[in-house]
Amino acid sequence: MFSSSAKIVKPNGEKPDEFESGISQALLELEMNSDLKAQLRELNITAAKEIEVGGGRKAIIIFVPVPQLKSFQKIQVRLVRELEKKFSGKHVVFIAQRRILPKPTRKSRTKNKQKRPRSRTLTAVHDAILEDLVFPSEIVGKRIRVKLDGSRLIKVHLDKAQQNNVEHKVETFSGVYKKLTGKDVNFEFPEFQL
């Protein structure tokens, strides 16, 4: 039988902690005895975290390698349903493990000869996290409200068609995003008038 850490590949060869091993084990069990076997066999995760998202509820964030994100998203709806059953209704979200490279300053410019790609900038990574978070629904608009004290509130407009599927999770999404990026975000399902 495979070990519980078979589905988790940590960067720099670190050892997965107990919680990550539990998630890995759950994925293995799903792979063994569900019809997701073929899709899950090729996939692994890089990390997992459990966080509080207000109201005493907990959410599980599972980080996956960027190249495998598309494959995860093909089966994400079913995978999330199964994992939520296993972990007694905690919300589960999948997010790609992305790196943010620091902004080149005068001092640090000489060290890295390569230009920093757009996909490694803070803005791009934070936007991408938001998109991963709300999958399978799509972001159809964004408004950033800057208050007088300088604080920002991001209003994210989600696809009305997916409202029934994700509406019960929007608080979780806000909590997870705040935890990962420190930014406040509100989710809305606007009616579109042309």
Swiss-Prot record:
Protein name: Small ribosomal subunit protein eS7
Modification N6-acetyllysine occurs at: 74
Subcellular location per the Swiss-Prot or TrEMBL entry: Cytoplasm, Cytoskeleton, Microtubule organizing center, Centrosome; Cytoplasm; Nucleus, Nucleolus
Protein keywords: Acetylation, Cytoplasm, Cytoskeleton, Diamond-Blackfan anemia, Isopeptide bond, Nucleus, Ribonucleoprotein, Ribosomal protein, Ubl conjugation
PROSITE patterns registered for this protein in UniProt: RIBOSOMAL_S7E
Organism name: Homo sapiens (Human)
Function according to Swiss-Prot or TrEMBL: Component of the small ribosomal subunit. The ribosome is a large ribonucleoprotein complex responsible for the synthesis of proteins in the cell. Required for rRNA maturation. Part of the small subunit (SSU) processome, first precursor of the small eukaryotic ribosomal subunit.
UniProt crosslink position (Glycyl lysine isopeptide (Lys-Gly) (interchain with G-Cter in SUMO2)): 70, 74
InterPro entries reported for this sequence: Ribosomal_eS7, Ribosomal_eS7_CS
Annotated disorder: Diamond-Blackfan anemia 8: A form of Diamond-Blackfan anemia, a congenital non-regenerative hypoplastic anemia that usually presents early in infancy. Diamond-Blackfan anemia is characterized by a moderate to severe macrocytic anemia, erythroblastopenia, and an increased risk of malignancy. 30 to 40% of Diamond-Blackfan anemia patients present with short stature and congenital anomalies, the most frequent being craniofacial (Pierre-Robin syndrome and cleft palate), thumb and urogenital anomalies.
